Amino acid sequence: MAEGGAADLDTQRSDIATLLKTSLRKGDTWYLVDSRWFKQWKKYVGFDSWDKYQMGDQNVYPGPIDNSGLLKDGDAQSLKEHLIDELDYILLPTEGWNKLVSWYTLMEGQEPIARKVVEQGMFVKHCKVEVYLTELKLCENGNMNNVVTRRFSKADTIDTIEKEIRKIFNIPDEKEARLWNKYMSNTFEPLNKPDSTIQDAGLYQGQVLVIEQKNEDGTWPRGPSTPKSPGASNFSTLPKISPSSLSNNYNNINNRNVKNSNYCLPSYTAYKNYDYSEPGRNNEQPGLCGLSNLGNTCFMNSAIQCLSNTPPLTEYFLNDKYQEELNFDNPLGMRGEIAKSYAELIKQMWSGKFSYVTPRAFKTQVGRFAPQFSGYQQQDCQELLAFLLDGLHEDLNRIRKKPYIQLKDADGRPDKVVAEEAWENHLKRNDSIIVDIFHGLFKSTLVCPECAKISVTFDPFCYLTLPLPMKKERSLEVYLVRMDPLAKPMQYKVIVPKIGNILDLCTALSALSGVPADKMIVTDIYNHRFHRIFAVDENLSSIMERDDIYVFEININRAEDTEHVVIPVCLREKFRHSSYTHHTGSSLFGQPFLMAIPRNNTEDKLYNLLLLRMCRYVKMSTETEETDGHLRCCEDQNINGNGPNGLHEEGSPSEMETDEPDDESSQDQELPSENENSQSEDSVGGDNDSENGLCTEETCKGQLTGHKKRLFTFQFNNLGNNDINYIKDDTSHIRFDDRQLRLDERSFLALDWDPDLKKRYFDENAAEDFEKHESVEYKPPKRPFVKLKDCIELFTTKEKLGAEDPWYCPNCKEHQQATKKLDLWSLPPVLVVHLKRFSYSRYMRDKLDTLVDFPISDLDMSEFLINPNAGPCRYNLIAVSNHYGGMGGGHYTAFAKNKDDGKWYYFDDSSVSTASEDQIVSKAAYVLFYQRQDTFSGTGFFPLDRETKGASAATGIPLESDEDSNDNDNDLENENCMHTN
């Protein structure tokens, strides 16, 4: 506990639980706490009602707040990349942080990780703790090689940055200067709005800012500050010029003026003025235009390239059809801003004038309406696609006033009737180019396990999220600590079931090591203490990849052996707070360990058992050292006997002694010599350990003489009696005598070492040493690939709903874990397939790198359609979004087929290169875009007929008015697949 004393556990639990519910307010400061430390604290205070069995147990005492796991090595302030809220860290408001620090202190040498709450979004306000600050590179105009890096909040202003730069380069306030935003090798943009924030200015991670000082003659080194287009301000992203005039006047755009200085031209006009767009080579192929990375925005670039190469959607925008369908009044839309911004970007990309453009205006508009995308952190490409398709749909929804629709269950009606009804109801509220191109219909069947009630509904979809066959196993690296005190820990790699338990881990380790599974105890060691001691029935999902798992061999059956008890042991180094005070403290070091010892024992025997347990890394003295009063080892010690730790229990094992002055905890204590034990026949010796001063079978001999000080004292905790204090030592050390000591399952020992003795006799390198088993080098064979159709079949497989996601049965009037089955009823002209590579759980995150074999052409989906009237439904691939790397990071690119020349190209941010079909199918494929073959005409796109845009997803034929339905019955074709041409 903190030196000044901590609040009782109930108060701690109540206070922090309340403060965790604090609402975010712009400008407030919150603090990051490593989730591992926080979980340990939750155990200690019994935070969760189901996890109170260790409440107050010093075995789980968290100690000082330790955020080292969040920081890059060697950097006290830089966070590791791709940390995830609640999985890697917990956010606490200032008051909560101050309370925890007052109770537990902060680890020495660490600084608080404080972050501000910023407000994101323009129309949809959203407060968020800015965990990752924006790193900017600062330099002077006259010396751009001297770059200084600083981190700023998105809420910091340009004025704040300028003051910091002036401070760094010793530029006086009275000296006139101006800031420039530097792009690439020789591209500059003035930052002339001091009140604008970093977010408003669109500054991104790693951006280079240059400060320029005015010459003595009143001129500027970089020339006049007025840009070629006086209206091309650099911060605002709201276009003043109409979209049509911009798209029709690319060549004259630099000559335009903006009357209202608060607004400016769209992003690409400013880029052209300042070379943000690379001029295309002569007759650049339309559509072969890269997108600059604004700082971790490759996810957005990949999504845009896939949509840009979706012919029906791009033709719609290039032909300005969107302008007559903009819906400015839709409360679910974005006032047409997303559609307009996207349209201008597409026109620029397909103008044939640029080899790449910078989509900053579009990025800013997206961030205004979807704050989760407003920063410059890596995001999920599919999540952006979902937002963008929905945003474009609502901005272009032809329905101006959505009617209320009462949803109905099938109630035994034919599927065709129910499907028709569902699609008609959908079109009454949702009618847009996005619906025309991307929306399909699937059938959902739920069956109640109690009353057998069957519920059938038909629901529209915009894309298919297909599960990948999951790996049923995972590999874990663990360390096995043998009973033999001379044996080094051995590292193993075990293959265990993903949904298995701790017993499965023990069984797998037993097969490799020969140690019986029932003689193992599995632990998680963190920060020199036991973070967790697992029960055999606990789920393996609670073990994360970064956990240090130690398995201890114990030669007793804990369920049957009533004579022994397993106790945790931790090592602590004592220190004094100052030379003039007697107040002492301690800090943990080394690896803790478990020991099985007799319940009824004497304290001196316990001391000797502990000493022998550490003999591999506790140095022995030579005869010369002995004469000087240094340590020596007792004789006749059984190293590998018949005790629960490989020790003989009847005698007193080795004693160590020094001539150091005794302290008050062990004054005048002397242990009698006990030499009646003989060496065991199966003793294990070391390899030249005696030459290195380490305790071995041969060196561990001798007897105690005189009044000597032991290597360490130890404190004993039996929950409910005296506590073991982490910071401030208790003076009531156990005295080393023969009085009986009764131990139980809640016993805990802390061994306190004097710093001088620890330095002299404790070999930390030997203590940390371990060996590797050959299994560590084993790489599990990976399944070569799965077919896309396997994923579709898995999507349509019947499953049981989870306990956390039950279905409300209208018949039982209760939530039930029903069985659910999805079936495809109809498919759209463009089918978007999302391969679900990322998986999340409470304890772990994972990316599946399974190779999915998908066809480039002739994907026949008819076998998966349950509509009995379904005809052929074949698709060709037109685009792929790729993700390289792991969870929370990596890089996105795209393959796409150009609609004009029919060739494949590879889009990697601003770079565009040719590609071949054999490159497209890879483990990186994440989102697939397929276009139905009947919507193509040659290499181009056969445009959608606006008059037949309402093709029924139920029958695949155009919807008719009531007046015409009877006359046209004979002309209808029984087709599926939402044919719209």
Curated annotation (Swiss-Prot):
GO MF entry, a single one: cysteine-type deubiquitinase activity
Compositionally biased region (Polar residues): 226-237
Residue numbers spanned by region Disordered: 216-237, 633-694, 952-981
Domain USP: 289-933
Protein keywords: Acetylation, Cytoplasm, Hydrolase, Mitochondrion, Nucleus, Phosphoprotein, Protease, Thiol protease, Ubl conjugation, Ubl conjugation pathway
Extent of Acidic residues compositional bias: 656-673, 960-974
GO BP: BMP signaling pathway; monoubiquitinated protein deubiquitination; negative regulation of antifungal innate immune response; negative regulation of transforming growth factor beta receptor signaling pathway; positive regulation of RIG-I signaling pathway; protein deubiquitination; protein K27-linked deubiquitination; proteolysis
UniProt xrefs under Gene3D superfamilies: Cysteine proteinases, DUSP-like, Phosphatidylinositol 3-kinase Catalytic Subunit, Chain A, domain 1
Residue ranges annotated for the DUSP domain, each copy included: 7-118
Stored SMART domains: DUSP (SM00695)
Modified-residue entries (Phosphoserine), positions: S229, S242, S961, S965
Post-translational modification summary for this protein: Phosphorylated. Phosphorylation protects against ubiquitination and subsequent degradation by the proteasome. Ubiquitinated, leading to degradation by the proteasome.
N-acetylalanine sites (modified residues): A2
Signal peptide: none
Keyword Cytoplasm: yes
Record text on subunit structure and interactions: A homodimer structure has been reported; however it is unclear whether the protein form a homodimer in vivo. Identified in a complex with the COP9 signalosome complex (CSN). Interacts with SMAD1, SMAD2 and SMAD3; the interaction is direct. Forms a complex with SMURF2 and SMAD7. Interacts with TGFBR1. Interacts with SART3; the interaction is direct. May interact with RNF20 and RNF40. May interact with PRKN. Interacts with INCA1.
Family: Belongs to the peptidase C19 family.
Entry protein name: Ubiquitin carboxyl-terminal hydrolase 15
Species whose genome carries this gene: Mus musculus
Gene that encodes it: Usp15
